[in-house]
């Protein structure tokens, strides 16, 4: 491929991505833990039905930003968020926002699989029940089956859905947590290093699942694995020392980043 053709392809990809609407918009987002400032005026927009990877060295602020997107930072004593984050134009930090409803719309999958100490069925049905999404037992059964299918787990557990979720393998437990998240029909799914505790085979299954989920959900993933970010995301944002260094199409970020700090991090020169 000659340089002219490469430039044309890159321009076409940029144009295609620029037409994707924003699902969430972060404006001048700063986060404080007590007197310590962890994020500095971050401006980052999350595109709809797109996987956005947040990368950067430990302590750079990427997980702090992720938790700000569904107000999980509210659970940390002394944490304060400044700036503005909107979901479909609505300020998620507005005092009138129902935080429980927000977290149903913006689900979270954590670093370590954390199934409830209940059956597989109860793990998935819990959210729909408390949010009133099922009018009957048949409705609930359908939601559970559909969610487990979307998480790529149904065929592995359909004959034992009333057994404990904690008896599953680590990779299965993480997919159960993803099924639990999608059961309440979220619009956005946040993933905080979802594969860090998994073996390569389980990781591959979760990454394949992320590709499939992108068709119906907007996904934001924090990862320390550059290879994973390159494999699963369409957009990548680089954080360093609480600042957003740059955000761009993933292909460009990994081949021709705008900031030398991004290049140094990707090449393993620090982090």
Curated annotation (Swiss-Prot):
Q: Which residues does ATP bind?
A: 56-63
Q: What is its main location?
A: membrane
List the GO terms this entry assigns under cellular component, sorted alphabetically. plasma membrane
Q: Name one GO molecular function term.
A: ATPase-coupled phosphate ion transmembrane transporter activity
List, alphabetically, the InterPro entries matched. AAA+_ATPase, ABC_transporter-like_ATP-bd, ABC_transporter-like_CS, P-loop_NTPase, PstB-like
SUPFAM superfamilies cross-referenced by the UniProt entry: P-loop containing nucleoside triphosphate hydrolases
Oligomeric and partner information: The complex is composed of two ATP-binding proteins (PstB), two transmembrane proteins (PstC and PstA) and a solute-binding protein (PstS).
In its UniProt entry, what is this protein called?
Phosphate import ATP-binding protein PstB
């Amino acid at each position: 491929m000659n340089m002219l053709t490469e430039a044309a392809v890159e321009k076409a990809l940029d144009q295609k991505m620029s037409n994707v609407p924003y699902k969430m918009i972060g404006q001048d987002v700063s986060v404080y833990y007590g007197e310590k400032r962890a994020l500095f005026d971050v401006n980052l927009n999350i595109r709809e039905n797109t996987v956005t990877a947040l990368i950067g060295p430990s302590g750079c602020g990427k997980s702090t930003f992720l938790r700000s997107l569904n107000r999980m930072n509210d659970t940390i004593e002394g944490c304060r968020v400044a700036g503005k984050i909107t979901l479909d134009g609505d300020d998620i930090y507005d005092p009138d926002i129902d935080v429980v409803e927000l977290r149903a719309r913006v689900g979270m999958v954590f670093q370590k699989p954390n199934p409830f100490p209940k059956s597989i069925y109860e793990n998935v049905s819990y959210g729909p029940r408390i949010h009133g999404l099922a009018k009957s037992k048949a409705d609930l059964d359908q939601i559970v089956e559909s969610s487990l299918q979307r998480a790529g787990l149904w065929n592995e557990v359909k004959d034992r859905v009333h057994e404990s979720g904690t008896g599953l393998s680590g990779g299965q437990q993480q997919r159960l947590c993803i099924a639990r998240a999608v059961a309440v029909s979220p619009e956005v799914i946040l993933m905080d290093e979802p594969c860090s505790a998994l073996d390569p085979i389980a990781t591959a299954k979760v990454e394949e699942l992320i590709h499939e989920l992108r068709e119906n959900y907007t996904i934001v993933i924090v990862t320390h694995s550059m290879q994973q970010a390159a494999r699963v995301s369409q957009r990548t944002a680089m954080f360093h020392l609480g600042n957003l260094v740059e955000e761009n199409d993933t292909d460009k970020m990994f081949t021709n980043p705008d900031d030398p700090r991004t290049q140094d991090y990707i090449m393993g020169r620090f982090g």
